[in-house]
Regions:
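Pyridoxal 5′-phosphate
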Residues: 1-172
């Protein structure tokens, strides 16, 4: 058998055997649409509600605050477009020039319809420095989106430092 190394785990990764086993009943037998009112949907709806409650408890949130998406791209779209279209009076978004394409494309889409976006430059090591963010941010900034660990070059950002500056200006 040929041996190989799969090096694109940032995009998709092998499913954990325990997760696979846990999903078999839902994929094979209990696949009703949890959003529908018919009887075949009761078990999936209950399982999703229970999963939402477990996750909420783990992160000290309310279950109503937990949303499941199909993956990172959909989540990025929700966060960026939802923030831009919110009625808060704060509509500017800040991201970096080295973000994942899902973030960059969502930011570009909001720019095309008039929402301001600023793109932070990275230093020679791929870092987004807090002092750089401090120069770009304003009280109109609603969202700052910086990838924690860059999917191409691996740089790990100072998220705590960036978050402190963002929160000081009322941004997420």
């Amino acid at each position: 058998m040929k041996q190989y190394i799969y090096a694109d785990n940032a995009a998709t990764t092998q499913l954990d055997p325990q997760a696979f086993e846990a999903m078999i009943p839902w994929l094979r037998d209990e696949y009703g649409n949890a959003s529908q009112p018919y009887s075949f949907s009761r078990k999936p709806k209950k399982a999703i509600a229970e999963a939402r409650a477990v996750i909420a408890e783990c992160i000290n949130a309310d279950p109503e605050e937990i949303y499941f998406t199909s993956g990172g791209t959909e989540s990025d779209n929700w966060a960026i477009k939802g923030s831009a279209f919110s009625d808060s009076g704060h509509h500017a978004t800040i991201t970096s020039q080295i973000e994942h394409h899902a973030v960059l494309h969502s930011c570009e889409a909001t720019e095309r319809i008039g929402y301001p976006v600023a793109y932070l430059p990275a230093d020679e090591e791929g870092r987004i420095l807090p002092e750089t963010l401090d120069r770009y941010i304003s009280d109109r900034t609603r969202l700052v989106s910086v990838i924690t660990a860059n999917n191409e070059i691996g740089t790990i950002q100072d998220i705590a430092g960036l978050a402190d500056i963002s929160h000081a200006h009322g941004a997420m």
